[in-house]
Amino acid sequence: MMLTIGAMTESFRRPFPEGVTMAADNRPSWDEYFMKMANDVATRTTCLRRGVGAVIVKDRRILATGYNGVPTGLTHCSETGCLREQLGVPSGQRHEICRGLHAEQNAIIQAARYGINIAGATIYVNTQPCVVCAKMLINAGIDEIVYQNPYPDELSQELLAESGILVREYTGE
């Protein structure tokens, strides 16, 4: 059996289909890359109100992901209906009246469950964290929050400002 090294090397050099190339300057920025991933993670939600995804990153490496949804093993809201809607609870109020967890909470829990240290990490989330998630991110040691869509929670913003966590709105590049 004869192995042709040149052909093998060429096949490894071409990660794209024939005729498709990607120049280094056309690659997405790290912010764009991780925010796209947060939006992709959000597609796993079974929440009937909002699709949120989060990606925790350190040194440009993904540590954990999370999306909003009920705890593992429980019936999804897409099957049971939205408790908050049934009770007439407005968005942004009474977070405890919900069967689900927020994306940031699930990402923190996944990291803890698998023994991953997220202190000093950055979280990319497609919606600005609520006050409950802000407090958890502060105590988890997150250094930076990059969010895409604003969320009107003044207390969250005040606590994050006081904590010294860098908070940036991602507006695309």
Descriptions of predicted regions:
Residues 2-173:
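Zinc-dependent deaminase catalytic domain
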